[in-house]
Amino acid sequence: MSTNLEVGIVGLPNVGKSTLFNAITKAGAEAANYPFCTIEPNVGVVDVPDSRLAVLAEMFGSKRILPAAMRFVDIAGLVEGASKGEGLGNKFLSHIRQVDAIAQVIRCFDDPNITHVAGSIDPIRDIEIINTELCLADLESVEKRKQRIEKIAKSGDKDARAELPLLERIIKGLGEAKPVRAQGLDEEELEMIKELTLLTAKPSLYVANISEDEVSDYSANEHVKRVEEYAKNEGAGIVVVSARIESEIAELSDEESAAFLEDLGLEESGLTKLIKASYALLGLINYFTAGEMEARAWTIVNGTKAPQAAGKIHSDIEKGFIRAEIVSFDDLQACGSQNAAKEKGLVRLEGKDYVMKDGDVTHFRFNV
């Protein structure tokens, strides 16, 4: 996984995808009511909100705060037939292969002024159009691979022989429009097909885009209920946002947006919900380093051991890793300072097998 987590935003034309993307990144990509206006994938980098950083900066007298970052890629309008090169099909597929997760914006609002490419509002149909295109693209990749592996298997290659039945199983599932992530593959099987970068194997999230009138209470929105049910059956995540509201928030200062959210009765913005859901989807956590220069968050996959976490900062620290000096953020905050935490015996030295936890405040000892 890349240093910055990368989420690809996809959706049919006119579902609010570019409006949401512009709000996310304030990048001002062209969000016209016009299919295919986003030809090159626009990339926007956003800070991952984490209130713990300000506490650490205050405690350590840090000159600056560096939050973790997340990259959102606006992937040009997908339409029916993209896997066969319709619309911007081939470009779409090459761009989406590079992302860590896919967020699919689904239109769950009625607005006669914004035409839907299929002429009516039906979120499940929209999801299935996109999923079918992704399944068809994967089917092509797996069938090509199968042809190659069959030749190798004939020469008696053991690995190729083991892989063939797996490929056949995946082909059968994709033919029934079943995403790879819903086919129950185990770790070993996923490793076997990793280099194929299959689109339907990527973690997926549905972003239900509702009207601004419903943002405080969308319990009566039948479209959202259907998407929630669909996501649950597929084991995918779901976030409900109003792209219009997000674009209004994007124009405001931090203080203004906090007041605006409070007026709407919301605890956090749709963007914050989207980032948190993406973190959960990819099993990510943050650890911290803090000192006079900076208080900084580093993103790692849950289950990462200390030396590999150190490698996020610099490969030399991973190579020369001796120990990690660690205190949990909660303990540190309760004690009020690093010294007080040390006196209470809450700062511990951990070796190379230590599995990092979310909120670990860390100082790595290493030798180059």
Which residues make up each language-model segment?
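Conserved G1/Walker A P-loop phosphate-binding module
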Residues: M1-T115, E143-K144, I149
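C-terminal-of-GTPase-core extension/linker across diverse P-loop GTPases
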Residues: M1-V10, V15, F21, R148-V355, ...
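Glycine-rich, flexible loop/turn motifs
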Residues: A27-P35, N42-G44, R52-V55, K84, ...
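Amphipathic alpha-helical transducer elements in NTP-driven molecular machines
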Residues: F36, D50-L53, L66-F72, E86-D100, ...
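Short capping/connector residues at structural and topological boundaries
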Residues: F36, P41-G44, S51-L53, E58-I65, ...
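Conserved Switch II/interswitch segment of TRAFAC-class P-loop GTPases
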Residues: G44-P49, A76-E86, R97-K158, G173-D186, ...
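Short, flexible surface segments
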Residues: Q98, K357-D358
